[in-house]
UniProtKB/Swiss-Prot annotation:
Protein name in the entry: Proline iminopeptidase
InterPro entries: AB_hydrolase_1 (IPR000073), AB_hydrolase_fold (IPR029058), AB_hydrolase_sf (IPR050266), Peptidase_S33 (IPR002410), Pro_imino_pep (IPR005945)
Top EC category: hydrolase
Keywords tagged on the record: Aminopeptidase, Hydrolase, Protease
Primary gene name: pip
Oligomeric and partner information: Part of the tricorn proteolytic complex.
GO CC field: membrane
Species: Thermoplasma acidophilum (strain ATCC 25905 / DSM 1728 / JCM 9062 / NBRC 15155 / AMRC-C165)
PANTHER family: HYDROLASE, PUTATIVE (AFU_ORTHOLOGUE AFUA_2G14860)-RELATED (PTHR43798:SF33), MONOACYLGLYCEROL LIPASE (PTHR43798)
UniProt function note: Cleaves H-Pro-AMC as well as a wide spectrum of amino acid substrates and several peptide substrates without a proline at the N-terminus. Proteases F1, F2 and F3 degrade oligopeptides produced by Tricorn (themselves probably produced by the proteasome) yielding free amino acids.
Reaction(s) this enzyme catalyzes, per UniProt: Release of N-terminal proline from a peptide
GO-annotated biological processes: proteolysis
Length: 293
Protein backbone atom coordinates (compact mmCIF):
# COMPACT_ATOMS: atom_id res chain seq x y z
CA UNK A 1 0.00 0.00 0.00
CA UNK A 2 2.75 2.47 0.85
CA UNK A 3 5.50 1.60 -1.59
CA UNK A 4 5.10 5.00 -3.30
CA UNK A 5 4.40 6.88 -0.03
CA UNK A 6 7.00 8.48 2.22
CA UNK A 7 6.12 8.88 5.92
CA UNK A 8 8.02 11.38 8.05
CA UNK A 9 7.80 14.18 10.60
CA UNK A 10 8.47 17.86 9.95
CA UNK A 11 9.20 20.33 12.72
CA UNK A 12 6.60 23.07 12.31
CA UNK A 13 6.31 25.98 14.75
CA UNK A 14 8.26 24.02 17.35
CA UNK A 15 6.32 20.73 17.25
CA UNK A 16 6.61 17.58 15.14
CA UNK A 17 3.90 17.18 12.51
CA UNK A 18 3.40 13.80 10.84
CA UNK A 19 2.98 13.68 7.07
CA UNK A 20 2.65 11.10 4.32
CA UNK A 21 3.66 12.06 0.78
CA UNK A 22 2.35 9.75 -1.96
CA UNK A 23 4.26 10.51 -5.13
CA UNK A 24 2.85 10.11 -8.62
CA UNK A 25 5.18 8.17 -10.95
CA UNK A 26 4.80 10.89 -13.60
CA UNK A 27 3.90 13.98 -11.63
CA UNK A 28 1.74 16.69 -13.19
CA UNK A 29 0.48 18.38 -10.01
CA UNK A 30 0.70 18.35 -6.23
CA UNK A 31 -2.36 18.14 -3.97
CA UNK A 32 -2.17 19.02 -0.28
CA UNK A 33 -5.05 17.63 1.80
CA UNK A 34 -6.57 18.81 5.08
CA UNK A 35 -8.54 16.35 7.21
CA UNK A 36 -11.60 17.22 9.26
CA UNK A 37 -12.64 17.08 12.87
CA UNK A 38 -11.19 19.26 14.09
CA UNK A 39 -9.30 16.40 15.70
CA UNK A 40 -9.54 13.52 13.23
CA UNK A 41 -6.45 12.24 11.40
CA UNK A 42 -5.48 11.98 7.74
CA UNK A 43 -6.33 8.26 7.55
CA UNK A 44 -9.91 8.62 6.28
CA UNK A 45 -8.62 10.62 3.29
CA UNK A 46 -6.30 7.84 2.10
CA UNK A 47 -8.73 6.87 -0.68
CA UNK A 48 -7.35 9.96 -2.47
CA UNK A 49 -4.10 8.05 -3.05
CA UNK A 50 -5.82 6.65 -6.14
CA UNK A 51 -5.13 9.99 -7.85
CA UNK A 52 -1.40 9.24 -8.05
CA UNK A 53 -2.35 7.11 -11.08
CA UNK A 54 -3.48 10.34 -12.77
CA UNK A 55 -0.14 12.06 -12.17
CA UNK A 56 -1.17 13.82 -8.96
CA UNK A 57 1.19 13.64 -5.98
CA UNK A 58 -0.86 13.72 -2.76
CA UNK A 59 0.28 15.08 0.62
CA UNK A 60 -1.54 13.95 3.76
CA UNK A 61 -0.72 15.26 7.24
CA UNK A 62 -2.08 15.09 10.77
CA UNK A 63 -2.81 18.60 12.05
CA UNK A 64 -1.54 19.84 15.42
CA UNK A 65 -2.61 17.58 18.29
CA UNK A 66 -4.20 15.12 15.84
CA UNK A 67 -3.33 11.57 14.86
CA UNK A 68 0.41 11.04 15.16
CA UNK A 69 1.37 14.72 15.48
CA UNK A 70 2.49 16.51 18.63
CA UNK A 71 0.22 18.83 20.55
CA UNK A 72 1.09 22.51 21.05
CA UNK A 73 -0.05 24.57 24.00
CA UNK A 74 -3.86 24.46 24.04
CA UNK A 75 -4.02 28.25 23.64
CA UNK A 76 -2.99 27.55 20.03
CA UNK A 77 -6.01 25.34 19.30
CA UNK A 78 -7.35 27.80 16.69
CA UNK A 79 -8.08 27.87 12.98
CA UNK A 80 -5.58 30.72 12.54
CA UNK A 81 -2.85 28.54 14.04
CA UNK A 82 -3.90 25.73 11.69
CA UNK A 83 -3.55 28.07 8.70
CA UNK A 84 0.01 29.06 9.69
CA UNK A 85 0.91 25.42 10.36
CA UNK A 86 -0.29 24.43 6.88
CA UNK A 87 1.64 27.25 5.23
CA UNK A 88 4.83 26.36 7.13
CA UNK A 89 4.49 22.70 6.11
CA UNK A 90 3.77 23.57 2.46
CA UNK A 91 6.77 25.87 2.36
CA UNK A 92 9.04 23.30 4.05
CA UNK A 93 8.09 20.48 1.67
CA UNK A 94 7.44 22.33 -1.60
CA UNK A 95 9.26 25.67 -1.34
CA UNK A 96 7.82 28.26 -3.71
CA UNK A 97 5.90 25.72 -5.79
CA UNK A 98 2.16 26.30 -6.08
CA UNK A 99 -0.07 23.39 -5.09
CA UNK A 100 -3.74 22.44 -5.17
CA UNK A 101 -5.39 22.39 -1.73
CA UNK A 102 -8.25 20.11 -0.72
CA UNK A 103 -10.03 20.35 2.63
CA UNK A 104 -12.66 17.91 3.89
CA UNK A 105 -15.32 18.90 6.44
CA UNK A 106 -13.59 21.08 9.09
CA UNK A 107 -10.57 20.81 6.76
CA UNK A 108 -12.72 22.64 4.20
CA UNK A 109 -13.15 25.49 6.68
CA UNK A 110 -9.39 25.48 7.28
CA UNK A 111 -8.73 25.43 3.52
CA UNK A 112 -11.02 28.43 2.97
CA UNK A 113 -9.24 30.34 5.76
CA UNK A 114 -5.88 29.37 4.20
CA UNK A 115 -6.98 30.51 0.73
CA UNK A 116 -8.21 33.88 2.02
CA UNK A 117 -4.66 34.54 3.28
CA UNK A 118 -2.41 32.49 0.98
CA UNK A 119 -4.19 31.95 -2.34
CA UNK A 120 -1.05 33.17 -4.13
CA UNK A 121 0.52 29.83 -3.15
CA UNK A 122 -2.30 27.80 -4.69
CA UNK A 123 -3.25 26.69 -8.19
CA UNK A 124 -6.72 25.73 -7.08
CA UNK A 125 -8.95 24.98 -4.09
CA UNK A 126 -11.26 22.02 -3.38
CA UNK A 127 -13.77 22.28 -0.52
CA UNK A 128 -15.36 18.90 0.20
CA UNK A 129 -18.29 18.87 2.63
CA UNK A 130 -16.73 22.05 4.01
CA UNK A 131 -18.10 25.19 5.63
CA UNK A 132 -17.56 28.92 5.91
CA UNK A 133 -19.83 29.30 8.95
CA UNK A 134 -20.14 27.08 12.02
CA UNK A 135 -23.42 28.73 13.17
CA UNK A 136 -25.05 28.08 9.76
CA UNK A 137 -23.78 24.48 9.76
CA UNK A 138 -25.20 23.87 13.26
CA UNK A 139 -28.54 25.37 12.18
CA UNK A 140 -28.61 22.98 9.20
CA UNK A 141 -27.64 19.99 11.36
CA UNK A 142 -30.49 20.83 13.74
CA UNK A 143 -32.83 20.77 10.74
CA UNK A 144 -31.54 17.27 9.88
CA UNK A 145 -32.12 16.19 13.50
CA UNK A 146 -35.70 17.52 13.31
CA UNK A 147 -36.23 15.31 10.24
CA UNK A 148 -35.07 12.10 11.98
CA UNK A 149 -37.58 9.45 13.09
CA UNK A 150 -39.22 10.64 16.33
CA UNK A 151 -37.44 8.03 18.49
CA UNK A 152 -33.99 9.34 17.54
CA UNK A 153 -34.94 13.01 17.33
CA UNK A 154 -36.44 12.96 20.82
CA UNK A 155 -33.45 11.09 22.32
CA UNK A 156 -31.00 13.63 20.86
CA UNK A 157 -33.03 16.57 22.19
CA UNK A 158 -33.77 15.02 25.59
CA UNK A 159 -30.29 13.81 26.48
CA UNK A 160 -28.38 16.41 24.47
CA UNK A 161 -30.01 19.30 26.35
CA UNK A 162 -28.90 17.84 29.69
CA UNK A 163 -25.42 16.88 28.45
CA UNK A 164 -26.11 13.15 28.96
CA UNK A 165 -23.94 12.23 25.98
CA UNK A 166 -23.12 8.75 27.31
CA UNK A 167 -26.76 7.67 27.59
CA UNK A 168 -27.31 4.49 25.49
CA UNK A 169 -30.44 5.90 23.81
CA UNK A 170 -28.54 9.06 22.91
CA UNK A 171 -25.61 7.02 21.57
CA UNK A 172 -27.99 4.92 19.48
CA UNK A 173 -29.51 8.10 18.01
CA UNK A 174 -26.06 9.55 17.24
CA UNK A 175 -25.14 6.31 15.49
CA UNK A 176 -28.34 6.48 13.42
CA UNK A 177 -27.60 10.11 12.45
CA UNK A 178 -24.05 9.17 11.43
CA UNK A 179 -25.25 6.32 9.19
CA UNK A 180 -27.64 8.75 7.49
CA UNK A 181 -25.45 11.83 7.21
CA UNK A 182 -21.78 10.94 7.85
CA UNK A 183 -21.23 7.67 5.96
CA UNK A 184 -24.13 5.77 4.39
CA UNK A 185 -22.54 2.35 4.54
CA UNK A 186 -22.99 -0.66 6.80
CA UNK A 187 -19.29 -1.48 6.94
CA UNK A 188 -17.10 1.52 7.60
CA UNK A 189 -13.55 1.29 6.19
CA UNK A 190 -10.74 0.79 8.73
CA UNK A 191 -9.24 4.12 7.63
CA UNK A 192 -12.42 5.93 8.74
CA UNK A 193 -12.56 4.02 12.04
CA UNK A 194 -8.91 4.87 12.73
CA UNK A 195 -9.57 8.60 12.26
CA UNK A 196 -12.58 8.42 14.59
CA UNK A 197 -10.49 6.55 17.15
CA UNK A 198 -7.83 9.27 17.08
CA UNK A 199 -10.52 11.96 17.51
CA UNK A 200 -11.77 10.11 20.59
CA UNK A 201 -8.29 9.64 22.05
CA UNK A 202 -6.76 13.08 21.54
CA UNK A 203 -7.85 16.46 22.96
CA UNK A 204 -8.48 18.58 19.85
CA UNK A 205 -11.95 17.30 18.90
CA UNK A 206 -13.35 17.75 22.39
CA UNK A 207 -11.82 21.22 22.90
CA UNK A 208 -12.34 22.74 19.44
CA UNK A 209 -15.52 20.92 18.38
CA UNK A 210 -17.41 19.28 21.24
CA UNK A 211 -18.90 15.88 22.14
CA UNK A 212 -20.08 14.91 18.63
CA UNK A 213 -20.58 16.07 15.05
CA UNK A 214 -23.76 18.08 15.63
CA UNK A 215 -23.10 19.37 19.18
CA UNK A 216 -20.49 22.05 18.56
CA UNK A 217 -19.75 23.60 21.94
CA UNK A 218 -15.99 24.02 21.48
CA UNK A 219 -13.79 26.97 20.58
CA UNK A 220 -14.89 27.06 16.90
CA UNK A 221 -18.61 27.41 17.70
CA UNK A 222 -18.91 31.06 16.56
CA UNK A 223 -16.43 30.87 13.66
CA UNK A 224 -17.69 32.45 10.41
CA UNK A 225 -15.68 33.81 7.46
CA UNK A 226 -18.51 33.88 4.92
CA UNK A 227 -17.99 37.63 4.42
CA UNK A 228 -14.29 37.11 3.56
CA UNK A 229 -14.33 34.25 1.05
CA UNK A 230 -15.42 36.40 -1.91
CA UNK A 231 -11.75 37.47 -1.94
CA UNK A 232 -10.84 33.98 -3.25
CA UNK A 233 -10.15 34.30 -6.98
CA UNK A 234 -8.43 30.97 -7.78
CA UNK A 235 -10.24 28.03 -9.45
CA UNK A 236 -12.47 26.47 -6.77
CA UNK A 237 -14.42 23.21 -6.70
CA UNK A 238 -17.02 22.64 -3.99
CA UNK A 239 -18.36 19.13 -3.41
CA UNK A 240 -21.10 17.94 -1.08
CA UNK A 241 -23.21 14.84 -0.57
CA UNK A 242 -26.97 14.93 -1.12
CA UNK A 243 -27.48 13.76 2.51
CA UNK A 244 -24.36 15.48 3.91
CA UNK A 245 -24.38 16.52 7.58
CA UNK A 246 -22.69 19.71 6.29
CA UNK A 247 -25.61 20.22 3.97
CA UNK A 248 -25.88 21.32 0.33
CA UNK A 249 -27.29 24.63 1.66
CA UNK A 250 -23.94 25.26 3.38
CA UNK A 251 -22.08 24.40 0.15
CA UNK A 252 -24.31 26.75 -1.87
CA UNK A 253 -23.39 29.70 0.35
CA UNK A 254 -19.70 29.09 -0.43
CA UNK A 255 -20.47 28.62 -4.14
CA UNK A 256 -22.41 31.88 -4.29
CA UNK A 257 -19.62 33.83 -2.58
CA UNK A 258 -16.68 32.55 -4.67
CA UNK A 259 -17.05 33.84 -8.22
CA UNK A 260 -16.56 31.21 -10.91
CA UNK A 261 -16.56 28.31 -8.45
CA UNK A 262 -17.99 24.93 -9.43
CA UNK A 263 -20.47 23.05 -7.22
CA UNK A 264 -21.01 19.29 -7.46
CA UNK A 265 -23.63 17.44 -5.39
CA UNK A 266 -23.01 13.68 -5.10
CA UNK A 267 -26.35 11.87 -5.33
CA UNK A 268 -27.14 9.21 -2.70
CA UNK A 269 -24.02 10.21 -0.72
CA UNK A 270 -23.51 11.90 2.64
CA UNK A 271 -20.41 13.45 4.24
CA UNK A 272 -17.64 10.99 3.40
CA UNK A 273 -18.29 10.92 -0.34
CA UNK A 274 -14.68 9.85 -0.96
CA UNK A 275 -15.71 6.38 0.29
CA UNK A 276 -19.33 6.26 -0.83
CA UNK A 277 -18.41 7.01 -4.46
CA UNK A 278 -14.66 6.53 -4.44
CA UNK A 279 -14.24 6.28 -8.20
CA UNK A 280 -16.56 9.17 -9.07
CA UNK A 281 -15.08 11.36 -6.35
CA UNK A 282 -11.47 10.83 -7.37
CA UNK A 283 -12.32 11.34 -11.04
CA UNK A 284 -14.08 14.65 -10.32
CA UNK A 285 -11.11 15.92 -8.30
CA UNK A 286 -8.41 14.73 -10.69
CA UNK A 287 -10.30 16.16 -13.71
CA UNK A 288 -10.57 19.52 -11.92
CA UNK A 289 -6.86 19.51 -11.04
CA UNK A 290 -5.67 18.48 -14.51
CA UNK A 291 -7.90 21.17 -16.06
CA UNK A 292 -6.21 23.91 -14.02
CA UNK A 293 -2.51 22.98 -14.20
Amino acid sequence: MDQECIENYAKVNGIYIYYKLCKAPEEKAKLMTMHGGPGMSHDYLLSLRDMTKEGITVLFYDQFGCGRSEEPDQSKFTIDYGVEEAEALRSKLFGNEKVFLMGSSYGGALALAYAVKYQDHLKGLIVSGGLSSVPLTVKEMNRLIDELPAKYRDAIKKYGSSGSYENPEYQEAVNYFYHQHLLRSEDWPPEVLKSLEYAERRNVYRIMNGPNEFTITGTIKDWDITDKISAIKIPTLITVGEYDEVTPNVARVIHEKIAGSELHVFRDCSHLTMWEDREGYNKLLSDFILKHL
